[in-house]
Swiss-Prot record:
Stored InterPro entries: DNA_mismatch_repair_MutS, DNA_mismatch_repair_MutS-lik_N, DNA_mismatch_repair_MutS/MSH, DNA_mismatch_repair_MutS_C, DNA_mismatch_repair_MutS_clamp, DNA_mismatch_repair_MutS_core, DNA_mismatch_repair_MutS_N, DNA_mismatch_repair_MutS_sf
Binding site residues for ATP: G646, P647, N648, M649, A650, G651, K652, S653
Lineage: superkingdom: Bacteria
GO molecular function, one term: damaged DNA binding
Keywords of this entry: ATP-binding, DNA damage, DNA repair, DNA-binding, Nucleotide-binding
Organism: Rickettsia massiliae (strain Mtu5)
Function of the molecule: This protein is involved in the repair of mismatches in DNA. It is possible that it carries out the mismatch recognition step. This protein has a weak ATPase activity.
Organism ancestry: Bacteria, Pseudomonadati, Pseudomonadota, Alphaproteobacteria, Rickettsiales
Protein family per UniProt: Belongs to the DNA mismatch repair MutS family.
Name the record gives this protein: DNA mismatch repair protein MutS
The keyword DNA repair belongs to this UniProt entry's keyword annotation: yes
CDD domains in UniProt: ABC_MutS1
Pfam family for this entry, one: MutS_IV
Biological processes annotated in GO: mismatch repair
Length: 891
């Protein structure tokens, strides 16, 4: 940051610019223009780093730090990485959230010498800036999830923000207006790798929450970067439009969001931006809102540690292509809220579930397809290889075979919604033939290796490769011709490094060289050497053939790529079709494999699940040859809240999570783990399940819990589903019960939404007497003497205790601790004045397990306090008698 605050003169002085070599001056000029980046400076076969960049990169990458002489009195730190291993090192730098500028050589050393003489410095410049949100390399990004760059624009009224996000690797670009209160939730849905934000918001609560709560990278830009006039011009220029209405009906802040994204891509990609479609405008309310903590609690796309194993995505993902997995990731991140669209997806899933033989064939064929979205992006950005074109060719071929599977099974009787999906699978014969006729099957990854274009496609390519592969034959052919012309049978064509190719004859045959086309080059003691125009031409062709053929192939390849780019819209439709097939065949596969059922959707406020199961827990139990205990859940307008009491380890939290997960799975268009499911569409899901101390943010468990609960109560609507577990447990019992009680009342009376509320506060169960839409449920247990068995069944009724001591014993607490706890529990129960009041009778949060004094100590203290206020000489007989009766009650 210190360098960013220095002006050019100060920078030159710091690095002794005036006494630096020409090459180091070139480096410094480029570095000064990219102070916010690590600069990788191409020198021959290495990318070198200098000064502070070298010290930092050496530590991050674990590579040796060396020196490159001195600049004035200062030693120049240096480290480097081989150019062919660049991606491996970039991975580490990007993972650490560094911005990397790639500076390449724009000419060869030979070209530099021809341009400026022996001391000329090779021309270099930054060809690309790599940031977490602008990666396209397969090795640097997760193949099964999007890699979004987002721009967030907050208008002056602050009521609605605009968000534009783009996945450069697939050319997806979307813009959406987001209510100010939902910004963090929307960002949690997208998980962008990088967010563009105005410098004016650097110290805002929003920026603080994005960075600390969501842990997303923010790249700040000056406020003018988001200026409306500038952004509108950028959009019009990029899409070659005359009127911004060509984008659609968009707000000013949406224009700023789109324009700033395009500008950032232009800056980082150095004008080499891929062919992006017109941004898709979506409605924020089209997708279920799931806030960050709920996504974490439910472990939807990642587990609680940020990995994939044990997440809902890992359980449901049996797609056979990485691009299909990416679409499933998007589905799970963004469940639908429109019944018609949900049912459309469910109908597709049902079709494939009813045609499992077709599913089996399609899944095998899909394995032969490629990620043509990312292939196309690399092609449009001039970073592709022949293998990308071959991938498109093979995918086109496989697509037509897949369509044939449908036609063979159904002919012309396919449902319309399936016909629409497979329409792009007809292929594009023109595109297929173009690639088939031009690109060799063994095309290398690197264009500079040559051998990418089929010889028969272009006569000059064939000729040059013939020279490369058969140069000696051409020389021998010319030799035979000259022998015949001169009659010298001993004539040879030889080569040395001084004069190149030459005709060699013995001195005694010199009189036979009569044709003036033979030009004398050299005479030795016994030999005379000649050349001809033909031989010079052949030599030139042989020497330059490799360079010429690579140059020609690059030109031809660029032309082929331009023709492929013209088919970009079709290729994206094809990719969408194939990705959709993979996901819906996956839904059919898991429905069959795990016995899932098609859910029914209704406009009513219902959530009627029969024999529901938690898909992740069920799969884990199956690996241990155990069975999952299913449970019903029947929420409705008349029974909106289930208050669930019962022991720990009995399955309350699993039950809460499984119902939220069933709603999510249903609304992405999949069958669900249940015997039947009837669901009123859920617009938002909120959960508060457990909380860890957030010491970094200075928040205790209780504060974190209250913040989450506050957000839930503020953002929920009548159509939301709330799951709450142990609200109020992080404070004293009195406070905890009071908070839980009032939260339940608020949900019942104000929000009137569906809610599952698990608690250890059994005092709350009396609320069913005066809250008509609240019903008590508990976990069934089986007692046998001193032992209990958790049956994991949810049944109607209320628990009268939590069996905490049994759970503590199972956890392995010392027997002495358990026995002492039993004594204390008995004392608590003796002080209880009635069912449901044993906890409220004492503020247990302030009691010590090991230093609890007998009840007499408490009585003695009260007596001391009472007697200290009494003057016996002033008591009347009646007052003395009343005092005796009062003291009698204390014993």
């Amino acid at each position: 940051m210190m360098l960013l605050n220095m002006n050019l003169q100060e920078l030159k002085q710091k690095y002794n610019y005036d006494v630096a070599t020409k090459m180091m001056q070139q480096y410094l000029d480029i570095k000064f223009a990219h102070l916010d980046c690590l600069l990788l400076f191409r020198m021959g076969d290495f990318y070198e780093m200098f000064y502070e960049d070298a010290i930092l990169a050496s530590n991050v990458l674990g590579i040796a730090l060396t020196k490159r002489g001195k600049n004035g009195e200062e030693e120049i730190a240096m480290c480097g990485v081989p150019y062919h291993a660049l991606e491996n090192y970039l991975t580490k730098l990007i993972e650490e959230n560094y911005k990397v500028a790639i500076c390449d050589q724009l000419e060869t050393p030979e070209e530099a010498k021809n341009r400026g003489g022996y001391k000329a410095v090779v021309t270099r410049d930054v060809t690309r800036i790599i940031t977490p949100g602008t990666i396209i390399e397969e090795n640097l990004i997760a193949s099964a999830e999007p890699n979004y760059l987002a721009s967030l624009v907050i208008p002056k009224n602050k009521e609605t923000a605009s968000l534009c996000y783009v996945d450069l690797s697939t050319s997806e670009i979307v813009v959406v207006n987001v209510p100010e209160t939902e910004i963090l939730n929307e960002l949690a849905r997208l998980k962008p790798r990088e967010i563009l934000l105005s410098e004016n918001l650097r110290s805002s609560n929003l920026a603080d929450s994005i960075f600390k709560q969501l842990n997303f990278r923010i790249t700040y830009q000056v406020d003018s970067f988001f200026a409306i006039n500038k952004c509108e011009k950028i959009i019009l220029d990029f899409y070659k439009m005359k009127d911004i209405k060509g984008i659609g009906e968009i707000s000013s802040s949406q224009i700023c969001a789109i324009g700033s994204v395009l500008e950032y891509l232009s800056l980082t990609q150095k004008q080499n931006i891929p062919h992006l479609p017109i941004p898709r405008i979506i409605n924020f309310h089209s997708y279920m809102t799931i806030d960050f903590s709920t996504r974490r609690n439910l472990e939807i796309v990642t587990n609680s540690q940020g990995g994939s194993q044990g997440s809902l995505l890992s359980t449901l993902n049996h797609t056979v292509t990485k691009q299909g997995g990416r679409l499933l990731y998007n589905f799970l991140s963004s469940p639908l809220t429109n019944i018609a669209k949900i049912n459309h997806r469910l109908n597709i899933t049902e079709f494939f579930y009813s045609n499992l033989e077709i599913v089996k064939k399609i899944r095998e064929l899909l394995k032969k397809t490629s990620d043509i979205e990312r292939c196309l992006t690399r092609i449009t950005m001039n970073r592709s290889s022949g293998r990308d074109l071959l991938s498109i060719k093979y995918t086109l071929e496989t697509a037509t075979i897949i369509k044939g599977v449908f036609c063979d099974a159904y002919g012309v009787n396919l449902p319309d919604f399936i016909e629409k999906i497979i329409k792009p699978l007809s292929g594009d014969a023109e595109l297929y033939n173009l690639i088939d006729e031009t690109i060799r099957e063994d095309a290398p990854n690197n264009l500079n290796d040559g051998g990418i274009i089929k010889h028969e496609y272009h006569p000059k390519v064939a000729q040059l490769h013939d020279l490369i592969n058969n140069g000696k034959l051409h020389i021998d052919k010319l030799k035979d011709q000259y022998r015949k012309e001169t009659g010298i049978d001993s004539l040879k064509i030889s080569h040395n490094n001084v004069i190149g190719l030459f005709i060699d004859i013995t001195a005694k045959n010199v009189n036979k060289i009569l044709d003036p086309k033979f030009i004398h080059r050299q005479t030795t003691v016994n030999h005379v050497r000649y050349t001809t125009a033909e031989l010079q031409k052949l030599e030139s062709e042989l020497v330059n053939a490799k360079t010429l053929v690579i140059s020609l192939e690059k030109a031809l390849y660029a032309d082929i790529c331009s023709q492929v780019i013209e088919k970009a819209s079709y290729l994206r439709m094809l990719a969408s079709s194939l990705n959709g097939l993979d996901v819906f065949c996956n839904f059919a596969y898991i429905a069959d494999e795990y016995d899932y059922v098609k859910p029914e959707f209704t406009d009513a406020l219902s959530f009627d699940i029969v024999k529901g199961r938690h898909p992740v827990v069920e799969k884990a139990l199956q690996r241990e040859s155990k069975s999952f205990v299913y449970n019903d859940c029947h929420l409705s307008e008349l029974e909106r809240i289930w208050l669930i009491t019962g022991p720990n380890m009995a399955g309350k939290s699993t039950f809460l999570r499984q119902n939220a997960i069933i709603a999510i799975i249903a609304q992405i268009g999949s069958f669900v783990p249940a015997k039947s499911a009837k669901i009123g569409v859920v617009d938002k899901i909120f959960s508060r399940i457990g909380a860890a101390d957030d010491l970094i943010k200075g928040q205790s468990t209780f504060m974190a819990e209250m913040l989450e609960t506050s957000a839930i109560l503020a953002q929920s609507t009548k159509n939301s589903l709330i799951i709450l577990d142990e609200v109020g447990r992080g404070t004293s019992t009195y406070d905890g019960v009071s908070i839980a009680w009032s939260v339940l009342e608020y949900i019942h009376d104000k929000l009137k939404c569906r809610c599952l509320f698990a608690t250890h506060y059994h005092e709350l169960t009396v609320m069913s007497n005066f809250l008509p839409a609240l019903q008590n449920y508990t976990i069934a247990i089986e007692e046998s003497g001193k032992d209990i068995l958790f049956l994991h069944n949810i049944i109607s009724g209320a628990a009268d205790r939590s069996y905490g001591l049994h759970v503590a014993a199972l956890a392995g607490l010392p027997a002495s601790v358990i026995n002492r706890a039993k004594q204390i529990l008995l004392k608590f129960e003796k002080t209880s004045t009635g069912k449901g009041k044993n906890i409220l009778s004492m503020e247990s949060n302030n009691l010590s397990l090991f230093n609890l004094e007998p009840n007499k100590t408490t009585i003695s203290s009260k007596l001391d306090e009472k007697f200290s206020t009494i003057d016996p000489d002033k008591l009347s007989p009646k007052e003395a008698l009343e005092l005796i009766y009062e003291l009698k009650k204390w014993v």
